Regions:
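Alpha-helix N-cap/helix-start motif at coil-to-helix transitions, marked by capping-box chemistry
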Residues: 29, 178, 182, 376-379, ...
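Conserved P-loop NTPase motor core
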Residues: 1-366, 415-416, 433, 437
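Charge-dense, low-complexity intrinsically disordered segments
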Residues: 175-178, 372, 401
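C-terminal helicase lobe
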Residues: 357, 362-392
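C-terminal accessory/connector segments of nucleic-acid motor ATPases
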Residues: 384-438
Length: 438
């Protein structure tokens, strides 16, 4: 907690520098002097102070790199990590190297003991332990190079069961986040008037709550699905394809979720069963499903006439794969559908990877904030930013694997001994053999 208080007084570009692309933070010389003066010591790097550097780094990362309702949520007095790709809480997982304790101090919740890691392995070396390796996903093509290089696996693209009728519209680009959000709300209002179901995808809990506030202020009835209310996922998704439904969701709704147009009769019937306290009546559910099937079928036909589910993304993700997963919620099994991404030049992705280039473009365009930007240069910058992130993340994974290869040789020896011990009828004989070897 002492370091959390010290770090609060430190200023960016004075006491520390941030590399936003790599999500790293480093104290400057002035920053080191500031910490030394606050602690009343002469040298932060003395052997007796080695833990201080560890605490400082963790607290700086907690302050500058990790954001509440983006990277984690605070629930029941605990810090819960949110998976950036799935939008779900990683139950039982904690950050290492003192970072979790730094976040607990930052959010003023009970600081728990640091976990002790007894064994670890990279995903790559873990998967390589299987003799036969295969997998299925709807978004493997964008990662084809990595599958070949790391796992020596080819990617085979299987045609869809029915032709895709979804229309993927060109990105709508705006100068500021405020202008983008206003355009998003206007689009939702227009679609909602017709009754077309809308799925609005956001990149974080914080963003989903901000959009929800705006929709509430405009009187738009909607549901919100994020890591804070994940227990309601089945009920919310069951209603997401119905006439007039507006669903605001994080990546939770962008992966492996089947949104049925007109609604899901089984799940809706179960909700009625719970509401009417009929859980002990085995006949109720079947009769309710049968009753709802006709209603859902009629509603589905109306939704199809309106163009199916409209998927609206409020920001491009670091990975094209995640964007494709969100688009894929619409136009399933040959149904019509539509998707569009709304982008601001202030979005995290653009700021981190194309900041200077975008600033140069904007100075040339001199457009008002609320005007939509239709420039090929901007579109190319967005594509370039995503390609940069994917390339950087791939390089990070390759480097992690290189370091783990050294440990992997030792790991294989240890696990070989472990297997021998577990399978041996006589441990004494094994110990004697090892004793002789030594």
């Amino acid at each position: 907690t002492e370091f959390t208080k010290i770090v609060k007084g430190m200023k960016r570009d004075v006491h520390y520098d941030i590399d936003e692309a790599k999500k790293q933070v480093h104290p400057t010389e002035l920053g080191i002097e500031y910490v030394e003066s606050k602690l009343g010591i002469s040298n932060l790097y003395e052997n007796s102070q080695t833990n201080f550097i560890h605490y400082l780094t963790a607290c700086l990362r907690a302050k500058t790199i990790f954001a509440k309702d983006v990277d984690y949520i605070v629930s029941n007095g605990q810090i819960n990590i949110v998976d950036e790709f799935t939008g779900r809480v990683l139950e039982g997982r904690r950050y290492s190297d003192g970072l979790h304790q730094a976040l607990e101090a930052k959010e003023n919740v009970r600081i728990q003991d640091e976990n002790q890691t007894l064994a670890s392995i990279t995903y790559q070396n873990y998967f390589r332990m299987y003799e036969n390796l295969a997998g299925m996903t709807g978004t493997a093509k964008t990662e084809e190079e990595e599958f070949i290089q790391i796992y020596n696996l080819e990617v085979v693209e299987i045609p869809t069961n029915l032709p895709i009728q979804r229309m993927d519209q060109q990105d709508a680009v705006y100068k500021t986040n405020e202008a983008k959000l206003n355009a998003v709300i206007e689009d939702i209002i227009e679609r909602n008037k017709k009754g077309q179901p809308i799925l609005l995808g956001t990149v974080s809990v914080e963003a989903s709550e901000e959009v929800s506030k705006q929709l509430t202020s405009k009187g738009i009835v909607h549901n919100v699905l994020n890591a804070k209310n994940h227990e309601q996922e089945a009920q919310i998704i069951a209603q997401a394809g119905r006439l007039g439904a507006v669903t605001v969701a994080t990546n939770m709704a962008g992966r492996g979720v089947d949104i049925k147009l007109g609604g899901n009769p089984e799940e809706i019937a179960f909700q009625y069963q719970v509401k009417e306290n009929k859980l002990d009546d085995p006949m109720y559910l079947d009769s309710k499903i049968h009753e709802l099937e006709l209603q859902v079928s009629e509603e589905k036909n109306k939704v199809l006439e309106l163009g199916g589910l409209y998927v609206l993304g409020t920001e491009r993700h670091d990975s094209r794969r995640i964007d494709n997963q969100l688009r894929g919620r619409s136009g399933r099994q040959g149904d019509p559908g539509e998707s569009r991404f709304y982008i601001s030049l202030q979005d995290d992705l653009m700021r981190r990877f194309q900041g200077e280039r975008i600033e140069s473009i904007m100075n040339k365009l001199n457009l008002p904030d609320e005007e939509r930007i239709e420039q090929s240069m901007v579109t190319k910058s967005i594509e370039r930013a995503q390609a940069q992130v994917e390339s950087l993340n791939f390089e990070i994974r390759k480097n992690v694997l290189k370091f783990d290869q050294v440990l992997n040789q030792q790991r294989e020896v240890i696990y070989k001994w472990r297997r021998q011990l577990l399978r041996s009828d006589s441990i004494e004989n094994l110990i004697s053999e090892w004793f002789d070897d030594v």
